[in-house]
């Protein structure tokens, strides 16, 4: 069989096209265990953390490496925090010590009112299998919905209470990139001011 230059080019372009289509279709959120926390404790005024919040942020350097709760033992391998706003830098400040101690980059370029953009980023950019997300508590219900979870099943009245800083939401994502299970647990950290 004699191959012409045109047939070789056509075959090559079809192969490249199928490779690009497969790459575009990859969902990097597939087979992930996603951990979601609220930022650490806040002062009555200001944009940062209070003393208890700074302590919690420091304790996270050990608590999440590895994360061992409820029979899980996973190594967090990517960090995401809601972007700084004029009122709060707390999500970033909560994960900054963990980022520094582990050498993992802290991605904090997406605002907490834009949950869909974070989900899109997790789907389209490689990030590992165990992302940890620190978010503002008032926006966590929207983030849960963006993942396909029900805030009403995970949070009292579908809202994260103002006074709670020590919960972790664990989302398991299946091979098709869809949520397979979701649960809320209480952190086993010993910290003054944490809830029982």
Predicted regions and their residues:
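Bacterial N-terminal signal peptides
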Residues: 8-17
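Active-site-proximal alpha-helix that buttresses catalytic centers in soluble enzyme cores
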Residues: 25-128, 139-196
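Periplasmic-binding protein-like
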Residues: 130-134
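Bacterial Sec-dependent signal peptides at the C-terminal "C-region" and cleavage site
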Residues: 16-28
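Bacterial N-terminal signal peptides that target proteins for export
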Residues: 1-9
């Amino acid at each position: 069989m004699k191959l012409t230059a045109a047939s070789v080019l056509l075959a090559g372009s079809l192969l490249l096209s199928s490779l690009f289509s497969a790459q575009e279709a990859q969902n990097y959120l597939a087979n992930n265990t996603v951990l979601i926390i609220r930022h650490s404790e806040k002062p009555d005024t200001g944009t940062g953390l209070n003393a208890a919040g700074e302590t919690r942020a420091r304790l996270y350097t050990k608590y999440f490496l590895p994360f061992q709760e409820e029979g899980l033992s996973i190594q967090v391998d990517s960090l995401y925090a809601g972007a700084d706003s004029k009122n709060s830098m707390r999500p970033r400040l909560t994960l900054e010590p963990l980022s520094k101690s582990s050498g993992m980059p802290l991605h904090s370029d997406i605002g907490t009112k834009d949950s869909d953009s974070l989900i899109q980023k997790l789907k389209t950019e490689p990030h590992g299998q165990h992302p940890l997300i620190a978010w503002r508590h008032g926006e966590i219900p929207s983030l849960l919905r963006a993942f396909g979870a029900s805030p009403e099943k995970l949070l009292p009245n579908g809202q994260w209470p103002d006074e709670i800083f020590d919960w972790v939401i664990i989302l398991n994502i299946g091979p098709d990139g869809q949520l397979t299970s979701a649960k809320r647990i209480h952190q086993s950290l010993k910290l003054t001011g944490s809830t029982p």
